Amino acid sequence: MASNEDFSITQDLEIPADIVELHDINVEPLPMEDIPTESVQYEDVDGNWIYGGHNHPPLMVLQPLFTNTGYGDHDQEMLMLQTQEEVVGYCDSDNQLGNDLEDQLALPDSIEDEHFQMTLASLSASAASTSTSTQSRSKKPSKKPSGKSATSTEANPAGSSSSLGTRKWEQKQMQVKTLEGEFSVTMWSPNDNNDQGAVGEGQAENPPDYSEYLKGKKLPPGGLPGIDLSDPKQLAEFTKVKPKRSKGEPPKTVPCSYSGCEKMFRDYAAMRKHLHIHGPRVHVCAECGKAFLESSKLRRHQLVHTGEKPFQCTFEGCGKRFSLDFNLRTHLRIHTGDKPFVCPFDVCNRKFAQSTNLKTHILTHVKTKNNP
């Protein structure tokens, strides 16, 4: 059974005030505090080079360049000079600001660093050229510079001269030796000892030739000055046979650039060819592990292991065979009786077919002289 519900619709219904009780709401006022304000004056950046202008020249920044600490450079720090791009067409006032910045350039503690001095020299030259080109591009150049500009122009060269000194630089060829070989590079070095280098270069001579003492000339009673025949190295150099130089052959005036080598050559091409001797020995014998500079020397050495002896003595009744032609030539002296090596001591006239035998014989004289 559905219930009956009554609905009534009223318009502009108002609730009497005596039925609903209204309460007053108290609103507290908000405290008012004075906040201090600052007036900020912004600089006119229309002419600033950072915002597209050109009143300020490019700044020069010294940035630290940290090296790899894995190679022992823990306490070393390099300075890298970095400049911003040059802005063309700036006015004379910019040049004055650039001169002021030169006096504020940061310098390292040690001004004796040659590489840093060279960099400063190039920077000073660049600043001077920039100043000159700016004055030439001026629309109305003044005939007589102002006192301030003249003082600044005259003071800058003096300052750079006092800081950089009178050192001159030149390019030199340096030999660099690596695991793969030796090569030459061009480096800048101070030209402080030009006179000493010229004197040393003029005094460079060919190493002394003692071959005449092996052919019959006798030694002086006091011996050769600066030569100790008891030293195996000096004795080997003394008994070393040097090739004869023809009369028309030019003198050898180019020294070997390798440290410790005193050989001389006719030209730089011959010296560069000789430098391969000081290079790495990459051709290794698989039998004994001996290394050689050239593959031809390795092939000649391998004859010792194979037992091959292609060089045979042609004298009747001999028939000896040798692996090297040099050994065959030395052997032939036995048949010919040729003994080109003569004892250089005055009291001895013995002769030998090989220089090694003469070297052994000289040691007997040296031992007798040192132990009378």
From Swiss-Prot:
Basic residues bias spans: 137-146
Region (Disordered): 126-172, 186-210
Protein species of origin: Homo sapiens (Human)
InterPro entries listed in its UniProt record: YY1-like, Znf_C2H2_sf, Znf_C2H2_type
One term of GO molecular function: sequence-specific DNA binding
GO CC terms in record: chromatin; nucleus; PcG protein complex; transcription regulator complex
Region named Mediates transcriptional activation: 32-102
UniProt keyword list: Activator, DNA-binding, Metal-binding, Nucleus, Repeat, Repressor, Transcription, Transcription regulation, Zinc, Zinc-finger
Name of the molecule in the record: Transcription factor YY2
Coiled-coil features, chain-numbered ranges: none
Task of the protein: Functions as a multifunctional transcription factor that may exhibit positive and negative control on a large number of genes. May antagonize YY1 and function in development and differentiation.
Subcellular location: Nucleus
Something else known: The gene encoding this protein appears to have arisen by retrotransposition of the YY1 gene in placental mammals. It is encoded by a single exon found in an intron of the gene MBTPS2.
